Design a protein with these regions (language model features):
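Conserved strand-to-helix beginnings and helix N-cap segments that scaffold or border functional pockets
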Residues: 23-24, 139-140, 166-167
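Conserved thiamine diphosphate
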Residues: 2-128, 153
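Glycine-rich phosphate/diphosphate-binding loop of Rossmann-like nucleotide-binding domains
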Residues: 128-149, 153-155
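Residue-level signal for short, function-critical loop segments
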Residues: 15, 43, 133-135, 159
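Short, conserved, surface-exposed binding loops centered on an aromatic residue
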Residues: 88, 119-122, 144-147, 169-171
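Short, catalytically relevant binding-site loops at active-site mouths
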Residues: 103-104, 135-137, 160-163
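Core nucleotide-handling region used for phosphoryl-transfer chemistry
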Residues: 147-171
Length: 171
């Protein structure tokens, strides 16, 4: 298709359909030949509770992570999603980006985004929480509550699930 002509297709649909229903096509027709196609799926996870269980794709990250050569991105908020789209346009190869339905502001405009690099958002000495997507905001809120009780945790935004930032995880 378009990717064989030097263009960069950005495909968009609900995660249930993009990762679930189209899995075989993504695996065989995009990832195996390493076509430069970006799959951006919204309404992922349980953030679409009111839409019912048939639309709650909780397995999309796992499915896309298993596909050889597929890069998997899960932005924490709209600002990070915007930066991820621009980064994916420059990135060569198949990629899946999971977007949630809920608005969860986390970052300022000057927040750095690099595919494959996790970001430490809060330093702590007692424990570390690695989060992606909607859970980044939840982890930051939990860190505030724990800090009030004298427990200092690190919060790491792992927006790139694959390839994982192994150096950040092992630090």
């Amino acid at each position: 298709g378009l990717s064989t002509m030097g263009l960069i297709p950005f495909c968009s649909t609900f995660a249930m359909f993009g990762a679930g229903r189209a899995y075989e096509q993504i695996r065989n027709s995009i990832a195996y030949p390493k076509f430069n196609v970006k799959i951006c799926c919204s309404h992922a996870g349980v953030s679409v509770g009111e839409d019912g269980g048939s639309h709650q794709s909780v397995e999309d990250i796992g499915l896309m992570r298993l596909v050889p050569g597929m890069t998997v991105i899960v932005p924490a908020d709209a600002k990070e999603a915007r930066k991820a789209v621009f980064a994916l346009a420059e990135f060569q190869g198949p990629a899946y980006m999971r977007l949630a339905r809920l608005a969860t502001p986390v970052f300022e405009e000057d927040y750095p985004f690099e595919i494959g690099k996790a970001n430490v958002l809060r330093e702590g000495k007692d424990a570390a929480v690695f989060a992606c997507g909607l859970m980044v905001n939840e982890a930051l809120e939990a860190a505030k509550l724990l800090a009030a009780e004298g427990v200092e945790i690190s919060v790491i935004n792992v927006h790139t699930i694959k390839p994982i930032d192994a150096a950040c995880v092992t630090e």
